[in-house]
Swiss-Prot record:
Protein name in UniProt: Lysozyme C II
Cross-referenced PANTHER family: LYSOZYME C
Biophysicochemical property: pH dependence: Optimum pH is 4.5-5.5. No activity above pH 8.8.
SUPFAM superfamilies: Lysozyme-like (SSF53955)
Annotated CDD domains: LYZ_C
Pfam families associated with the record: Lys
GO molecular function list: lysozyme activity
A GO CC term assigned to this protein in UniProt: extracellular space
Cysteine disulfide partners in this protein: 21-142, 45-130, 79-95, 91-109
UniProt main location, coarse: secreted
Keywords: Antibiotic, Antimicrobial, Bacteriolytic enzyme, Disulfide bond, Glycosidase, Hydrolase, Secreted, Signal
Species assigned in the record: Oncorhynchus mykiss (Rainbow trout)
Biological processes, Gene Ontology terms: defense response to Gram-negative bacterium; defense response to Gram-positive bacterium; killing of cells of another organism
Amino acid sequence: MRAVVVLLLVAVASAKVYDRCELARALKASGMDGYAGNSLPNWVCLSKWESSYNTQATNRNTDGSTDYGIFQINSRYWCDDGRTPGAKNVCGIRCSQLLTADLTVAIRCAKRVVLDPNGIGAWVAWRLHCQNQDLRSYVAGCGV
C-alpha cells in the first residue's frame, strides 16, 4: 500500500499545467518556433485546445486508442501504451513519457508527427480552432 501511495505522489509531482507564456517560452527554447513551417503561436494554440496546457491530459478514443499529454499524441500511431491493438509506436516511446512536466519527449514526438504528410493538420483541435486564425494572442505579452 505504501508503494502505491509513493507512486501516486511521484505521478502527481511530475504533472504540470503550464501557463500560456511559460509554455510559449519552453516551446521556443526547444526549437518549435518555425519548426516544419509552423510558428510558435500555432503550437501554443494547438496545446491550448488539445490539453488546456495540461501534461497529464488523456482522452480515450472510440477506436480504442488514447491521446496523451500536452499535445494529445495518439497511441495508435505514435506511442506505446500497452493496450492499443495494432499500435505502430512511430516515436518509439512509452505513452506515459508524454505525461510528465518535462516536455522533452513530447516535443521530440510532436516534431516527428508534424513531418508526416498531414503536418500540423494531424491535430483535429488545430484544424478546428487554430487554422487560418489570427493567433498572435497566444504569445502576446510573453516576450517571445
